[in-house]
């Protein structure tokens, strides 16, 4: 019995299609559910952005958890400032109301004596023992609550420093930047203190007063961060070995923080190692003059615009977890686009970044006109 031969070479079925490196960044449009591709991509992302080690002494804090903590602290601090401002205004109104009748009594008594007494002559005033004490507050004026400072209260204005230039009062976390001083001045997270890792090698006073205040304190934590976990992991391990139990490390550092929150949390210009590299072949290289990096501002609190941007990117990061598939998002957006008065303008808050679009706001016309996107 003869062996039946196949038509053609069977090696053609096992031959792999050559891949073009120019289009390796292009992903499949239909990508739903769990797959081996997603699992491999997740492992590659972990190896690329994180440096996990066995038996880590310190705890890790996710970037999204840190953003939620910042929003809560800022909102509570703003409410406390509003209540404090109202109380100060009410106390000032009460003080001004009580000082007016006292000022009238003092004006009638001329600052000394009773209202019925006559003012002494200039000669008697000079020869008297109390010469030169006319402008001073008398016993009666002091008892009634009017003194020298109260009389000059309207002339001298109090110069109080702006509270927005100071850190949040009773902040539950202490944020430490373990990079060198130059990197801190170029770029850092708003509200972070500069604490280079070389400070831990000091023989005397390696910790500041703030660190000693937050060390193992109830309801407070210490957070360390750097660019890519190289320095922060070493500093966190050393501090944990020295007895710090409430120490956390920002997982991923500025590199992951810049990917998930490009605006709002960081002040200054990001270093080149933390910026996202464009995929090959996605855009042509244009010869443009390099702009010098802007230094970081001396900023300790987040503005309302910063908080809106943080909330926007936080919703974008948590959005795919709420919706199981992209196909359902596209269908829902197509139905919304047919209704006059679409709700696409409501997805982006006022003051948020205009360059990032929400996938829910894309209409069906965009999907049909540009199928390659």
From Swiss-Prot:
Protein's UniProt name: Centrosomal protein of 41 kDa
Q: Does the keyword Acyltransferase apply?
A: no
Complex formation: Found in a complex with TTLL6.
Q: Which domain of life is it from?
A: Eukaryota
The UniProt similarity line reads: Belongs to the CEP41 family.
Q: List modified residues, type Phosphoserine.
A: 96, 99, 114, 121
Q: Which UniProt keywords apply?
A: Cell projection, Ciliopathy, Cilium, Cilium biogenesis/degradation, Cytoplasm, Cytoskeleton, Methylation, Phosphoprotein, Protein transport, Transport
Its GO biological process annotations read:
cilium assembly; protein polyglutamylation; protein transport
| Location of region: Disordered | 89-127, 275-300, 315-373
A Pfam family that the UniProt record links to this protein: Rhodanese
Instruction: List residues modified as Phosphothreonine.
Output: 109
SS bond partners = none
Q: Where is the composition biased (Polar residues)?
A: 107-127
Protein's cellular compartments: Cytoplasm, Cytoskeleton, Microtubule organizing center, Centrosome; Cell projection, Cilium; Cytoplasm, Cytoskeleton, Cilium basal body
Residue ranges of the Rhodanese domain? 169-266
Omega-N-methylarginine carried by residues: 343
- One GO cellular component term, please give it: centriole
The question of whether Protein transport is a record keyword is answered with yes
State the organism of origin: Bos taurus (Bovine)
Q: Give the gene symbol.
A: CEP41
Q: What is the lineage of its organism?
A: Eukaryota, Metazoa, Chordata, Craniata, Vertebrata
Q: What does this protein do?
A: Required during ciliogenesis for tubulin glutamylation in cilium. Probably acts by participating in the transport of TTLL6, a tubulin polyglutamylase, between the basal body and the cilium.
Q: Which PANTHER family match?
A: CENTROSOMAL PROTEIN OF 41 KDA (PTHR44390:SF1)
């Amino acid at each position: 019995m003869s062996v039946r031969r196949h038509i053609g070479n069977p090696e053609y079925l096992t031959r792999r299609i050559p891949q073009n490196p120019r289009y390796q960044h292009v992903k499949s449009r239909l990508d739903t559910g769990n797959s081996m591709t997603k699992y491999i991509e997740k492992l590659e992302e972990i190896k690329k952005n994180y440096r996990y080690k066995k038996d880590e002494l310190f705890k890790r804090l996710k970037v999204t958890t840190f953003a939620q903590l910042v929003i809560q602290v800022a909102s509570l601090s703003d409410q406390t400032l509003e209540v404090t401002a109202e109380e100060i205004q009410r106390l000032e109104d009460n003080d001004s109301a009580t000082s007016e009748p006292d000022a009238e009594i003092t004006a009638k008594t001329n600052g000394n004596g009773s209202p019925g007494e006559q003012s002494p002559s200039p000669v008697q005033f000079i020869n008297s023992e109390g010469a030169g004490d006319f402008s001073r507050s008398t016993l009666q004026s002091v008892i009634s609550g009017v003194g020298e400072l109260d009389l000059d209260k309207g002339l001298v204005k109090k110069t109080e420093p702006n509270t927005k230039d100071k850190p949040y009062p009773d902040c539950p976390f202490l944020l430490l930047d373990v990079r060198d001083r130059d990197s801190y001045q170029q770029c850092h997270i708003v509200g972070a203190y500069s604490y280079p890792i070389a400070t831990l090698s000091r023989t005397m006073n390696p910790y500041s007063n703030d660190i000693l205040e937050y060390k193992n304190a109830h309801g407070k934590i210490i957070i360390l961060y750097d660019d890519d976990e190289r320095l922060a992991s070493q500093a966190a391990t050393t501090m944990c070995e020295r007895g710090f139990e409430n120490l956390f490390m920002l997982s991923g550092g500025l590199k992951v923080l810049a990917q998930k929150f490009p605006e709002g949390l960081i002040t200054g210009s990001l270093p080149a190692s933390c910026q996202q590299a464009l995929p090959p072949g996605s855009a042509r290289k244009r010869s443009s003059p390099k702009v010098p990096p802007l230094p970081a501002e001396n900023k300790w609190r987040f503005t309302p615009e910063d908080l809106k941007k943080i909330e926007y990117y936080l919703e974008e990061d948590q959005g795919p977890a709420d919706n199981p598939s992209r196909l359902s998002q596209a269908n829902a957006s197509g139905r919304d686009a047919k209704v006059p008065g679409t709700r696409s303008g409501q997805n982006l808050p006022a003051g948020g970044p205009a360059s990032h679009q929400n996938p829910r706001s894309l209409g069906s016309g965009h999907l049909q006109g540009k199928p390659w996107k």
